[in-house]
Amino acid sequence: VLLGCVLPAGLGQAPARQAALGAGLAQTTRCTTLNKMCGSGMQATILGHDLLRAGSAEVVVAGGMESMSRAPYLLEKARSGYRLGHGALIDSMFLDGLEDAYEPGRLMGTFAEDCAARLGIGRERQDAYAQQSLARARQAQASGAFAGEIVPVEVVTRKETLRLDTDEQPRRADPARIPTLKPAFREGGTVTAANASSISDGAAALLLMRASTAAHEGLTPLATIRGHAAHAGAPGDFPTAPIGAIRTLLERIDWQLGDVDLFEINEAFAVVALAAQDALGLDPERLNVHGGACALGHPIGTSGARILVTLIQALRHRGLRRGVAAICIGGGEATALALELND
């Protein structure tokens, strides 16, 4: 079991191990928790793929999980003692997830602002993209397109048993308010709470095995991983890093852009998807067709796996075959993965 988790403070030892045993897997199951920021869930899938190729595993559960709403506050000097003067509470979500490690205190959204200004992607276009993402997510919910990728969870209370089977974030948003929101990261800026991803909780996982193992177990694989790639650059350039990852991936597996039926590019910010769309010349009708993180949220360690799950189901829903998913990563990196549905 390989599971991404970026905000593990307060979760107890080895969150992936806890998840595996809590799900009823055998105590002999090997487990690893990964932290590659926003790319954790995809990196878990990549490592699972490579373990299978190397013959080091027979079956891998790969994915990610994040409960951003439970990220604790920290008292940095509590162990050694606060001697004199004021102390401060440190938000572990900001410190470990939303702030740049190389310019302490600088939020990821300020780099999205820089990217938007550099590429000339204005507020109106970002807002229009966010509204489109929301509309697509709501349409996918209404049509049942998400049903194949969501495992319902039952929560038992003293009064009733609640069945959770629908993302709540799209229902909370008001598309009419999107153009009226104030900039979130910079006075006079263009990035807002609506055209950026929301803070949310979630988990996603994929079951990986070789085709021979699936046949032996009587299982029919949904898709085959055709390749993966990564890109790294300056930490502040993370919003455009998926462009390099996708280009490297397509060259590596000898696919052309036209060979790809659907793309999923994580909407950490609307400008990330728009930058890739412009640089690669992507058809907007083939990009994030069921909406993205602007509408659904971005649980940090989860999203890399979530977009793979969504991509597979979107391809199935439309009767298509090939897809590419990519995600930007705090620190200046990105990963991309190509898959193809099986006959």
PLM segments and residue spans:
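Conserved active-site "lid/cap" helical segment
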Residues: V1-L11, P15-A23, R30, D114-R123, ...
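Conserved beta-ketoacyl condensing-enzyme motif
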Residues: V1-V60, G64-R83, I150-L164, L257-A279
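Conserved catalytic cysteine-centered active-site region
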Residues: C5-E58, Y102-M108, R172-S198, A279-R306, ...
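Active-site-proximal alpha-helical scaffold in enzymes
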Residues: K36-E66, A116-A145, A205-S212, Q277, ...
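Flexible glycine-/small-residue-enriched beta->alpha junction loops
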Residues: V59-C115
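Condensing-enzyme catalytic core mediating Claisen C-C bond formation in acyl metabolism
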Residues: D91, P175-T240, G244, E251-I253, ...
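Active-site pocket-lining segment
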Residues: F111-E113, E149, V156, R226-A295
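N-terminal extracellular/periplasmic Venus flytrap/periplasmic-binding protein-like
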Residues: R125-H216, A279, P284-R286
